[in-house]
Amino acid sequence: MNFTKLFVVFAVVLVAFAGQSEAGWRKRVFKPVEKFGQRVRDAGVQGIAIAQQGANVLATARGGPPQQG
């Protein structure tokens, strides 16, 4: 019985402190990772656009219609 009460009190205290904690270390660790992911995404989108333009130029040079994308 005492163990159950102790466990409940410990769980409540743990939730109270965990819920109010600041995300300082997580922010320091994951912010650069998030920025890196955004740069990779943006570079991929830009690379696809450049490849599509190159395909359009090639198709125009060959005399066909440009590719739709």
UniProtKB/Swiss-Prot annotation:
Q: Does the keyword Nucleotide-binding apply?
A: no
| Induction annotation | By bacterial infection.
What keyword terms does UniProt attach to this protein? Amidation, Antibiotic, Antimicrobial, Immunity, Innate immunity, Secreted, Signal
Which InterPro entries does this chain map to? Cecropin_insect (IPR020400)
Q: Which residues carry this modification: Glutamine amide?
A: 68
| Tissue specificity annotation | Following bacterial infection, expressed in fat body, trachea and muscle.
From its record, what is one biological process in GO terms?
Answer: innate immune response
Signal peptide span: 1-23
Q: Which GO terms describe its cellular component?
A: extracellular region; extracellular space
Q: Where is the protein localized?
A: Secreted
Q: What family is it from?
A: Belongs to the cecropin family.
Give a short account of what the protein does: Antimicrobial peptide active against Gram-negative bacteria E.coli KCCM 11234 (MIC<=1.03 uM), E.aerogenes KCCM 12177 (MIC<=2.07 uM) and P.aeruginosa KCCM 11328 (MIC<=2.07 uM). Not active against various Gram-positive bacteria at concentrations up to 4.14 uM.
PANTHER family from the UniProt entry: CECROPIN-A1-RELATED
- This protein is called what? Cecropin-like peptide 1
Name the species this protein comes from. Answer: Hermetia illucens (Black soldier fly)
